[in-house]
């Protein structure tokens, strides 16, 4: 068996081969194993020694040999199953030994691992999966013995451990910076193709094709050679995949692959003089003709180098002799089935006079024959003729032109003269011989698999790859040129799905870097041409556009982005756009800035109002979550004025689109959200300006739409108040709606389909609106005595045992807090806080607890300083209420309350209670998740200078939570770490993140990068 060489060196000094491994497998000292306990004791000693990296290398090397001896002599004693369970314990120490930089340790570790893999196969896959990256790392080492040890170990792993994880690991090295690792990957792909189970191999064949393609296109020539060898193996075992790969590369690579098919142990024909491989190098048409050609000597072909053969002479002569049409091109494998007898035996001996009549008309020989490569027979001195070999002048000229006398010697003087004339004619017609034609003549032709769709040329494919590469370049000039070419590429209709995905990623990246008009125009062209295949891209593309428009300051740039957004609105299916927008709103990774949220709401409003058909259904879980998220945006006091008007417009658009779905959707919400919704609808109906009678009226359809929408709003408002007792307030004022019907008559409520079974008579709009004012407490602001009595009565209700009265009292207090009519804080704050805490602790009603949480939130925003001393208790009460609740929506209310508490109360106290909860030995998973979410909101809501002093206290707790067995806790821990990095920067967080494993750290980095690209407020 040939040795595995990791890099090009003269000779094979200091190189370890697979044979060396096999010889060493059982060359170990004999060891007595008396019992399973004896085996375990010896294994413990071995593990102890191998786990010490600083231990004497000779001891460690002997222990590695001892492992093989224990397996050989102990398997029969303790049994295979028990042996395997013990061997798994070696995983860490074997991996450490494979990583060792001493060649003696590495060699023995590699031999031991190879021995285990060959003997036990996938039963020890855990060891193989751990050691494979370490073995690959050794392949890149400059020391030959270490590099080849690592390379041979990878061969054993891939041959005997046939798992998807192993393939995924080796595939990752296709982009390695080290050429030796990329070259080794090709050797491993050959093993996968040859040895792996068909069932497993079938699932990874497309990936194998991509890896071989990458190797064929590699910058390193030796890697390209290895890639061509892997392609030959793929062609031999899976011709369909090979044909697909062949069709996907450009013409130069196709030619290279055909040359690889045709190549033998030597590149020139004279090294395979007159043997079958030469025929396999010819196209099928050439073989058919040359086989019967009467005037071509086998010695002529055998004695000339490949570059000296005049291919046109041979093919045309063969064509003229056989007079048969060309056969369809066949693959190399098909050609190899043709008779493989020695090459010269199939050519008939030249017949006198047979050539002369055809040569002058059909033969097109070259006037001059290219010189052979250095070292070929053409460069050697010509043999001196004997005295008996006297040639006429014509024969000498033919001899000098053809460079060989074996073919010419069989011709008569007359034939030689005619041949010379034909060659002179060819010299005039073929002034510039093409070496490419020579190459093509010698290369087998592959059939291109037929496809239903037009096949794009390899030139187009390479052009797309070139543009993508240029747009990703760090060179400003190269990127600029790539962006210019991008505009023409994206509108091509025959792009593959992979190219569309790559182009979409490039456009998103360019959009995140700067506002470039060419990029925006390219996105518009991209969307117009390929929108049926861009459903996966839509969400990310919209997120980028919203973030970019929200961050943009110049009016001109905003207009350009708006044009691109309008193109998306008009191109994609509205239902798909609504779904993608809802997913974007609810995605916790896309941390949109307030201005970006405004852009999103504007887009959503336009989508609902102009592009979706009236009556379209939207009662989905995604839409419900979107509305809840929108409410949370509107409730944020810092951005309330910016976002609320746009959120209210979206609510009205939803109602106008399908009022039945709107009502059904809000029936699932808690009463507060329902109240908020109909108040929004009511306020928008009331605030519309009344058109003057003498003003120019709108078109009839527009007026009808306004009238219908107004009537629907009335119906919704009235239906929401049917359960309220119609008690007239003396202070009630008659307020008429601002909406007018087409006939300018006052609005009257239409019969509501939703509640027709509950209504016996129509209620006027004024009466229904009056009912909204019944619970108003604004009149108590100035009347302190009345307010004191009112608050005392409500506190008594809250403290009572009746659930309904408790709920009513909490709602009344909440109304006062919302309207700002609760002014007697000095007298009532402590009483109200105790009452709220009692509800959170003792109430059995989840609805009461949710209202109590909202009251606590309002108390914190209004009188945060009064709550300072009760910070820890407040947070604990909220957490207990959420954890003990069976209501799925309780966590949403608790999240909002905790966010308010964390951002308004003393930071030190919030950090202290968070540490205590997260550091509990058996922390409750729901409670830990809520605390981590609270900390995430904390880092999103406060300034970096406030948070820097506490990061050293909080970060270890979050890192610890990342190791939780609960996936929900791990997920929230990742979001919290991302928020920390975004706010404080990677440099500040790096000391803490070093405690994470590489996989976890990579995951955090991925989310950080996503957050950076989508948020204009990133601090990283």
Swiss-Prot record:
Keyword rRNA-binding: no
Source species, domain of life: Eukaryota
Compositionally biased region (Polar residues): 329-343, 450-460
Subcellular location(s) per record: Cytoplasm, Cytoskeleton; Cytoplasm, Cytoskeleton, Microtubule organizing center, Centrosome; Chromosome, Centromere, Kinetochore; Cytoplasm, Cytoskeleton, Spindle
Matching InterPro entries: ARM-like, ARM-type_fold, CLASP_N_dom, TOG
Chain spans, region Disordered: 259-280, 329-387, 419-461
Self-association and partners: Interacts with hcp-1 and hcp-2.
Protein name according to UniProt: Protein CLASP-2
GO annotation, cellular component aspect: basal cortex; centrosome; cytoplasm; cytoplasmic microtubule; kinetochore; microtubule organizing center; mitotic spindle; nucleus
Stretches forming HEAT repeats: 954-992
GO annotation, biological process: astral microtubule organization; attachment of meiotic spindle microtubules to kinetochore; cytoplasmic streaming; establishment of mitotic spindle localization; meiotic chromosome separation; meiotic spindle midzone assembly; meiotic spindle organization; microtubule polymerization
Gene3D superfamilies according to UniProt: Leucine-rich Repeat Variant (1.25.10.10)
The keyword Cell division appears for this protein: yes
Biological role: Probable microtubule plus-end tracking protein that promotes the stabilization of dynamic microtubules. Required for the formation of mitotic and meiotic spindles. Specifically promotes the polymerization of kinetochore-bound microtubules. Also required for cytoplasmic streaming. Essential for embryonic development.
Biased composition (Low complexity): 259-271, 372-381
Keywords assigned: Cell cycle, Cell division, Centromere, Chromosome, Cytoplasm, Cytoskeleton, Kinetochore, Meiosis, Microtubule, Mitosis
Organism of derivation: Caenorhabditis elegans
Pfam families noted in UniProt: CLASP_N (PF12348)
Family membership: Belongs to the CLASP family.
């Amino acid at each position: 068996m040939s040795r595995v060489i990791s890099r090009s060196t003269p000779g094979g000094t200091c190189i370890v081969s697979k044979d060396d491994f096999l010889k060493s497998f059982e060359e170990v000292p004999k060891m007595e194993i008396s019992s399973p306990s004896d085996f375990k004791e010896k294994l413990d000693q071995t593990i102890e020694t191998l786990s010490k990296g600083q231990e004497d290398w000779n001891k460690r090397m002997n222990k590695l040999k001892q492992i093989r001896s224990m397996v050989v002599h102990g398997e029969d004693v303790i049994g295979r199953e028990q042996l395997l369970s013990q061997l798994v314990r070696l995983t860490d120490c074997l991996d450490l030994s494979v990583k060792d930089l001493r060649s003696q340790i590495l060699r023995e570790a590699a031999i031991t691992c190879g021995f285990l893999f060959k003997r036990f196969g996938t039963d020890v896959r855990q060891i193989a999966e751990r050691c494979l990256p370490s073995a690959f790392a050794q392949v890149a080492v400059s020391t030959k013995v270490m590099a080849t040890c690592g390379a041979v170990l990878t061969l054993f792993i891939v041959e005997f451990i046939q798992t998807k994880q192993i393939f995924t690991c080796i595939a990752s090295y296709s982009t390695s910076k080290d050429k030796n690792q990329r070259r080794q990957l090709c050797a491993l792909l050959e093993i996968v193709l040859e040895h792996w189970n068909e069932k497993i191999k079938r699932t990874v064949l497309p990936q194998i094709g991509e890896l071989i393609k990458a190797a064929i296109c590699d910058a390193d020539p030796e890697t390209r050679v290895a890639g061509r060898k892997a392609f030959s193996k793929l062609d031999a075992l899976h011709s369909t995949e090979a044909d697909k790969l062949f069709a996907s590369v450009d013409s130069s690579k196709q030619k290279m692959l055909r040359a690889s098919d045709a190549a033998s142990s030597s590149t020139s024909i004279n090294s395979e003089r007159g043997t079958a491989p030469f025929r396999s190098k010819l196209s099928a048409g050439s073989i058919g003709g040359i086989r019967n050609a009467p005037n071509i000597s086998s010695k002529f072909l055998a004695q000339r180098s490949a570059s000296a053969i005049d291919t046109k002479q041979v093919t045309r002569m063969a064509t003229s002799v056989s007079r048969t049409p060309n056969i369809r091109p066949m693959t190399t494998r098909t050609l190899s089935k043709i008779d493989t007898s020695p090459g010269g035996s199939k050519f008939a001996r030249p017949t006198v006079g047979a050539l002369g009549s055809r040569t002058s008309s059909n033969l097109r020989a070259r006037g001059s024959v290219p010189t052979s490569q250095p070292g070929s027979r053409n460069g050697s001195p010509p043999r001196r003729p004997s005295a008996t070999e006297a040639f006429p002048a014509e024969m000498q000229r033919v001899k000098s032109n053809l460079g060989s006398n074996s073919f010419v010697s069989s011709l008569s003087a007359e034939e030689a003269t005619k041949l010379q004339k034909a060659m002179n004619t060819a010299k005039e017609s073929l002034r510039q011989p093409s070496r490419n034609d020579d190459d093509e003549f010698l290369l087998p032709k592959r059939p291109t698999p037929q496809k239903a769709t037009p096949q794009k040329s390899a030139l187009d494919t390479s052009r797309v790859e070139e543009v993508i590469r240029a747009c990703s370049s760090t060179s400003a000039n190269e990127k600029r040129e790539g962006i210019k070419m991008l505009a023409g590429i994206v509108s091509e209709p025959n792009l593959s799905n992979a190219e569309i995905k790559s182009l979409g990623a490039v456009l998103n990246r360019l959009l995140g870097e700067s506002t470039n008009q060419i990029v925006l125009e390219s996105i518009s062209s991209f969307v117009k041409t390929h929108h049926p295949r861009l459903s996966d891209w839509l969400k990310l593309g919209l997120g980028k556009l919203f973030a970019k428009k929200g961050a943009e300051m110049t009016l001109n740039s905003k207009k350009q982005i708006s044009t691109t957004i309008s193109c998306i609105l008009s191109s994609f299916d509205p239902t798909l756009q609504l779904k993608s927008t809802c997913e974007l709103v609810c995605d916790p990774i896309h941390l949109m800035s307030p201005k970006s949220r405004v852009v999103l709401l504007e887009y959503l409003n336009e989508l609902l109002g102009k592009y979706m058909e009236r009556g379209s259904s939207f009662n989905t879980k995604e839409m419900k979550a979107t509305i809840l998220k929108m409410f949370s945006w509107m409730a944020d006091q810092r951005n309330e004025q910016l976002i609320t008007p746009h959120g209210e417009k979206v609510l009205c658009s939803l109602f106008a689109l399908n009022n039945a779905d709107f009502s059904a959707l809000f029936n699932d919400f808690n009463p507060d959200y329902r109240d908020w919704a109909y108040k929004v609808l009511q306020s928008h109906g009331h605030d519309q300006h009344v058109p003057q009678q003498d003003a120019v009226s709108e078109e009839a359809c527009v007026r009808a739409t306004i009238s219908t929408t107004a009537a629907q709003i009335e119906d919704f408002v009235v239906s929401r108040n049917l359960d309220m007792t119609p008690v007239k307030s003396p202070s009630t004022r008659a307020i008429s709606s601002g909406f007018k019907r087409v006939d300018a008559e006052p609005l009257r409520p239409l019969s509501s389909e939703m509640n027709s079974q509950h209504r016996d008579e129509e209620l006027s709009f004024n009466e229904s609106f009056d009912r909204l004012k019944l619970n108003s407490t604004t009149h108590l602001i100035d009347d302190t005595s009345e307010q004191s009595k009112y608050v005392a009565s409500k506190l008594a209700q809250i403290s009572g045992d009746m659930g309904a009265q408790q709920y009513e009292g909490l709602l009344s207090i909440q109304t006062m807090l919302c309207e700002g009519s609760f002014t007697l804080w000095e007298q009532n704050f402590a009483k109200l806080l105790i009452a709220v805490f009692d509800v959170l602790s003792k109430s059995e009603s989840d609805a009461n607890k949710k209202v109590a949480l909202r009251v606590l939130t309002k108390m914190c925003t209004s009188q945060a300083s009064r709550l300072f001393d009760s910070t820890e208790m407040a947070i604990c009460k909220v957490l207990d209420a959420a954890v003990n609740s069976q209501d799925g929506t309780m966590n949403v209310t608790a999240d909002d309350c905790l966010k308010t508490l964390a951002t308004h109360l003393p930071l030190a106290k919030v950090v202290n209670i968070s540490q205590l909860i997260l550091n509990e030995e058996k922390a409750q998973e729901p409670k830990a998740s809520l605390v981590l979410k609270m900390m995430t909101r904390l880092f999103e809501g406060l300034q970096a200078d406030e948070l820097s002093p506490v990061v050293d206290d909080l970060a270890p707790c979050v890192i610890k939570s990342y190791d939780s067995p609960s996936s929900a806790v791990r997920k929230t821990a990742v979001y919290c770490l991302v928020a920390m990095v975004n706010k404080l920067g990677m440099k500040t967080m790096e000391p803490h993140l070093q405690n994470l494993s590489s996989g976890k750290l990579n995951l955090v980095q991925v989310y950080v990068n996503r957050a950076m690209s989508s948020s204009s407020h990133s601090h990283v």
